[in-house]
Amino acid sequence: MAETKPTYYITTPIYYPSGKLHIGNSYTTIACDTLARYKRAMGYDVYFLTGTDEHGLKIEEKAEKLNTDPKSYVDGMAKQIKDLWQLLEISNDKFIRTTDDYHERAVQEIFDRLLKNGDIYLGEYEGWYSVDDEEYFTETQLAEVFRDDNGKVIGGKAPSGHEVELVKEQSYFFKMSKYADWLLDYYQSHPDFIEPANRMTEMINNFIKPGLEDLAVSRTSFTWGVPVKSDPKHVVYVWIDALTNYITALGYATGDSEDLFNKFWPADVQMVGKEIVRFHTIYWPIILHALGLPLPKKVFGHGWLLMKDGKMSKSKGNVIYPETLVERYGLDALRYYLVKAMPYGNDGLFTPEDFVARVNYDLANDLGNLLNRTIAMINKYEDGQLPAFKAGVTEFDADLEATAATTIKNFNACMDSLHLSDALAEVWKLVSRTNKYIDETAPWQLAKSDDANDADKLASVMAHLAASLRVIASLISPVMTHAPKEIFTQLGLDPATLAIADLQLADLPAGAQVVAKGTPIFPRVDMDAEVEFLKGKMTKSDKQKGRKAMENAKHEAEVEQGWNPAETNLNLTKPAITIDDFDKVELKVAEVITVQKLKGADKLLQFRLDAGDADHRQILSGIAKWYPEPEELIGKKVIIVGNLKPRKLRGEMSQGMLLSAEHDGQVQLITVPDNMVNGSLIS
């Protein structure tokens, strides 16, 4: 009978597809992916869930603004998020969308069960509602209150800074207040349920002790949601619709098999940002308890990845997107940085200077140079073959061996306790100790000696270096998906043998042939140039720096001798313009999200495009004649005129223009390589 593996179920929050995800959003998914990969390497049967929360008024309004329907809008956004996770090599087992049929069926069933059990009742709600936050607030909870001349409250701002509006409507309520004492008792008997511990203290003091209010769980003021089965004019609100995804994804209440639910629930770790800890540690546990289900073993609320001027915000112009960093520095650099930059439970800080420093110092210098030196010395001193590992041959071996053993032990402890940044710090202690070991043993001196003992020492040093790199590569493999395999390959080891379980320094396969010449796995970058590049990506006012640099280069360049451009016939078809005229035009890279023929206009195609803006934009183009199957354009990267004044065509708004080329009556869209980042400026 086959041995049953222990199970491990880990979830990210499901992401609200109202805009493009930045590196702060991506952290949660990369952190969960790191844990999922680690647990798989340790022999667990892992189920890793992520997805999108696709209902609500905000989505309905976004779609209306873009002249599309909500389903088409979220289809495009879900594809964009899936594409990002693929770029980041996220190893999720399932991607749930709250618009999936099985989820909607389950939500209706769950709502119906709670209603029949008496935990949900019909009432009327009046309060200040923030569309962006999808949350109601009392007047005392508002960060700012607006009053008329008579002192009457007429509006205000939520703690997030988003404006609120007064909403009064019939609503179904969940009896949250009924379970306050039970939840407090549960916290006290399960002190590890919420981590870090200060989050639990915050929940108790700020929300439970002041008194839990019953929770509105349906809406009638919009239609984009799951209808209540017994009362279809109501749609199920986010608290039941979104939170239950963690169990419906496993088959609970779907009417299908619940084998996955029985196998993996309760979740081992549910990782969320600190801003939604309340929903996952108050609303979610109470809903589960009312359904008679066990609670997740742990909810971990991580901090925010901040900029120097606070949270990332498109309005501040301080947002940076993962695609930019992956394209320029590689995926491993981004994954390493995000995991390293976020200390346990606290906020992390992103600065261009720190990011580039980590690429150069941690990756290129410390790890990359260690590999390069080791490969070069094994080729030079051992004919490219890994010597057999022997313990304690030199006076420095024992300390390196002890450091490796401690690193493995501490790394595993950090990973198991969700101290991911500390886990990497432990590995870099071994990286540092191994670099020091080279200086201590001075292999170049041992190689000059005629003493046979020194030859044995030299072989031992080479074996220890290779063995240490093998351990380092194995430990970082949950975080970095490329470098560990490359380290193994350069050492002549099979990347398929990368493993963390039962890892030991001494288990180095002898006789493997290293590569004849090592290749840098993390090339050094120019510090000043890269900091300037990143600042340009983060700051609105710096967007034209690249173009200005190009123009400066043109002015400084000397004309090639022997050729007079003034004599060239330019064959102009339109009046000449100056560079200042051209500089007024904003050309941007955009990705085609959806495209279809415009109803009632056979010549026009209706494009929805991601041009790196906060929202998608719509452009109408008269190229339908040349693209009889326009769906083939979905996913293509095109060039648009981004600052063309919007105009209406056939009753639809067109927010720009697509660039195309025409020859002999044939028209073709101009496309660019897929690896170009959406929103990149064309100069």
Swiss-Prot record:
Entry EC number(s): 6.1.1.10
Catalytic activity annotation: tRNA(Met) + L-methionine + ATP = L-methionyl-tRNA(Met) + AMP + diphosphate
Organism: Lactiplantibacillus plantarum (strain ATCC BAA-793 / NCIMB 8826 / WCFS1) (Lactobacillus plantarum)
Listed name of the protein: Methionine--tRNA ligase
Gene expressing this chain: metG
Location in the cell: Cytoplasm
UniProt entry keywords in alphabetical sequence: Aminoacyl-tRNA synthetase, ATP-binding, Cytoplasm, Ligase, Nucleotide-binding, Protein biosynthesis, RNA-binding, tRNA-binding
Single biological process term from Gene Ontology: methionyl-tRNA aminoacylation
InterPro entries with a match to the protein in the record: aa-tRNA-synth_I_CS (IPR001412), Anticodon_Met (IPR041872), Met-tRNA-synth_bsu_C (IPR004495), Met-tRNA_synth (IPR014758), Met-tRNA_synth_2 (IPR023457), Methionyl/Leucyl_tRNA_Synth (IPR015413), MetRS_core (IPR033911), NA-bd_OB-fold (IPR012340)
